Amino acid sequence: MNWEIVIGLETHTQLSTDAKIFSGSSTRFGAAPNTQANVIDLALPGSLPVMNRGAAERAIRFGLAVGGKVAPRSVFARKNYFYPDLPKGYQISQYELPVVLGGSLSFFVGEQEKTVNLTRAHLEEDAGKSLHDDFALASGAPASGIDLNRAGTPLLEIVTEPEMRSAAEAVAYARALHSLVVWLGICDGNMQEGSFRCDANVSVRPVGQKEFGTRTEIKNVNSFRFLERAILFEARRQIELIEDGGTVVQETRLYDADRDETRSMRSKEDAHDYRYFPDPDLPPLVISPEWVEEVRANMPELPAALRERFQRDYGLSAYDAAQLSASRGLASYFEDVARALPAGQAKQAANWIMGEVTATLNREEKDIADAPVQAPALAALIGRIIDGTISNKIARDVFSAMWAGEHGGQPDAIIEARGLKQISDTGAIGAMIDEVLAANPAIVAEYRAGKQKAFNSLVGQIMKAAKGKANPQQVNELLKQKLEG
């Protein structure tokens, strides 16, 4: 039997406010435990929450970016459950009336464009953190600790429809969402610090079946690589369980990266288990049309609009435009390079940035802002390819030297110092071709007998004789003339 995976994601995005969502405590990461929790975060008697306007403004920004409906009136609700790091015994969230409804996000899986619809995005407070590893009492006895610094940190939980059908698609969506919230400036996107965490709802069903299977939820995955591995394992586990005659149980599971498996955490609750009801301590969140327009007026150019502009103004493919608009920094870098080149050469800039620049950044785990080769220097290097000073092959060597800081990272100085200028003199190239043809009569005969590979072999020998400096286009043209003349 053939199976189909059904995936929906819930993403907890920590909002980039200086203060918590309902208190004035700092949200700064890394402080000593329990030094950033005030009476509201500790749920001391008589303390009352006050809404952080900045958190609401960031939610509006997100809603506009995904084409969702920003609710003119949304309500905070108490989500009741017990956990040691939840001081109040409930979490302040939104249930029936969230701040954003609907919307969608488009992204690429490979070179295929996909769109996933969003169900909602709602504001809520984060819980504290339970500490188990390397934690003990003064006596040395093992124990668990509670750090409430994170309690009350503002979250925007973004929920998709169950429309993804592969782990690769889910990861591509998560990456696109991560890029968007960082682009908008509503989240720092630091996954290691827990700023961007995904819950994956996974089920399987026979291909062609309309009804969904029983889903499990994989909680708090904070790595794209782990997200893919967790979904793949869980889908495989469910399929094997069903094929062996078992039944999938609705439950919450955790992904164990060391064992590359998911394991049961608890039975999955339904909404009624949380006994949601409106929080009597918080008034409804009222968002006026004027406030929405004020936020809209201060929005940056969105990735979707930028992709369209890159295709229109620079003649890029939809895929190239999407790759280059993955972050604001990368998009700015591309535009700076493209604008410094002659008209019609933007594709050269795109190829270099998506190729050598991105590969080197990934290898060194750097961001585009930390690239040693600045946009003007890369444009100068590409310019030397365009004017025939060097070949693409030599340009890659020059780029490596620029990245290493040789001669101040200036391509012209590196080309001059290394003697890398391309040979474009037709007389000199013709003489080298004559020598290679005279030394390889058998290969010449093969070409004239119709073997195209023989031509490539001759080109290789000519380039070797020229130490890679001969203009490849001229070599090809002159060689063909001599062979067919």
UniProtKB/Swiss-Prot annotation:
SMART domains: GatB_Yqey. GO terms for biological process: glutaminyl-tRNAGln biosynthesis via transamidation; translation. Heterotrimer of A, B and C subunits. Allows the formation of correctly charged Asn-tRNA(Asn) or Gln-tRNA(Gln) through the transamidation of misacylated Asp-tRNA(Asn) or Glu-tRNA(Gln) in organisms which lack either or both of asparaginyl-tRNA or glutaminyl-tRNA synthetases. The reaction takes place in the presence of glutamine and ATP through an activated phospho-Asp-tRNA(Asn) or phospho-Glu-tRNA(Gln). The lineage of its organism: Bacteria, Pseudomonadati, Pseudomonadota, Betaproteobacteria, Burkholderiales. It holds the Pfam family GatB_Yqey. GO terms for molecular function: asparaginyl-tRNA synthase (glutamine-hydrolyzing) activity; ATP binding; glutaminyl-tRNA synthase (glutamine-hydrolyzing) activity. Its EC number is 6.3.5.-. Belongs to the GatB/GatE family. GatB subfamily. This is Aspartyl/glutamyl-tRNA(Asn/Gln) amidotransferase subunit B. It is an enzyme of class 6 (ligase). Disulfide bonds: none annotated. The keyword Cell inner membrane does not apply. It catalyses: L-glutamyl-tRNA(Gln) + L-glutamine + ATP + H2O = L-glutaminyl-tRNA(Gln) + L-glutamate + ADP + phosphate + H(+); L-aspartyl-tRNA(Asn) + L-glutamine + ATP + H2O = L-asparaginyl-tRNA(Asn) + L-glutamate + ADP + phosphate + 2 H(+). Transmembrane segments: none annotated. It comes from the Bacteria. HAMAP family: GatB (MF_00121).
